[in-house]
């Protein structure tokens, strides 16, 4: 039976959102919602869509995992030589989007992306499981590879080079980024597609302007 995509719809009605109900800090409001998503058992609650733009102005997006909120900025880790790494090198502005369907909520965040310190990258890398560390050496992320067997061969090579229980150094091409927010939108699903949308817009690195926008 063929599904008519135009007929697929869901009515949202479980919650509401108003400016009088939110916290003064968008980061603290985000922490509140994230904790509620975790408590609700949201699947991959820390998963976020990261959107970047390359030097030709072409956008790309992919799912990455939030690994921390440090000094009000959002931290993730990746291969610096990946497509996203190249995009960030040429255009440091990006956007994040978290979607928690269990709570009928999403959060959109815009800001500037910079690398975290090598020390912070080392600390996180050293906390990873052994096979994840090996994987960082094996994968030339976003580059063409001839076969799965080629990847498996590289796994064996690096497992022999860095046996389990030994120190696996962090590759220089692998590390963290942090997105410093300048804009947040908190979205709460409501009936008849008249959703609640509350914005925090940073003014001059000092003050957050808070207002409602139309659905």
Curated annotation (Swiss-Prot):
PANTHER family: PYRIDOXINE-5'-PHOSPHATE OXIDASE, PYRIDOXINE-5-PHOSPHATE OXIDASE
Required cofactor names: FMN
Residues annotated as signal peptide: none
Presence of keyword Oxidoreductase: yes
Keywords recorded for this protein, A-Z: Flavoprotein, FMN, Oxidoreductase, Pyridoxine biosynthesis
Gene: pdxH
Residues holding substrate: 9-12, 67, 124, 128, 132, 193-195
Gene3D superfamilies, per database record: Electron Transport, Fmn-binding Protein, Chain A (2.30.110.10)
The protein's role, per its UniProt record: Catalyzes the oxidation of either pyridoxine 5'-phosphate (PNP) or pyridoxamine 5'-phosphate (PMP) into pyridoxal 5'-phosphate (PLP).
Cofactor note: Binds 1 FMN per subunit.
Full protein name: Pyridoxine/pyridoxamine 5'-phosphate oxidase
Pathway noted in the entry: Cofactor metabolism; pyridoxal 5'-phosphate salvage; pyridoxal 5'-phosphate from pyridoxamine 5'-phosphate: step 1/1; Cofactor metabolism; pyridoxal 5'-phosphate salvage; pyridoxal 5'-phosphate from pyridoxine 5'-phosphate: step 1/1
């Amino acid at each position: 039976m063929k599904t008519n995509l135009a007929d697929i719809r869901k009515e949202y009605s479980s919650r509401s959102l108003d400016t009088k109900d939110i916290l003064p800090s968008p980061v603290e409001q985000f922490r509140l919602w994230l904790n509620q998503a975790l408590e609700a058992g949201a699947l991959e609650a820390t998963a976020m869509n990261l959107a970047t733009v390359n030097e030709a102005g072409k956008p790309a997006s992919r799912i990455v995992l939030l690994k921390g909120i440090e000094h009000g900025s959002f931290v993730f880790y990746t291969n610096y030589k990946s497509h996203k790494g190249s995009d960030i090198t040429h255009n440091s502005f990006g956007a994040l989007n978290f979607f928690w369907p269990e709570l009928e909520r999403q959060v959109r965040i815009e800001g500037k992306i910079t690398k975290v310190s090598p020390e912070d990258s080392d600390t996180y890398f050293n906390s990873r499981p052994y096979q994840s560390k090996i994987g960082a050496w094996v994968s030339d992320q976003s580059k063409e590879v001839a076969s799965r067997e080629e990847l498996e061969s590289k796994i064996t090579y690096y497992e022999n080079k860095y046996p389990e229980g030994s120190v696996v150094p962090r590759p220089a091409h692998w590390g963290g980024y942090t997105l410093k927010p300048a804009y947040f939108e908190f979205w709460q699903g409501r009936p008849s597609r008249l959703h609640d949308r509350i914005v925090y817009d940073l003014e001059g690195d000092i003050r957050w302007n808070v207002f409602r926008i139309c659905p």
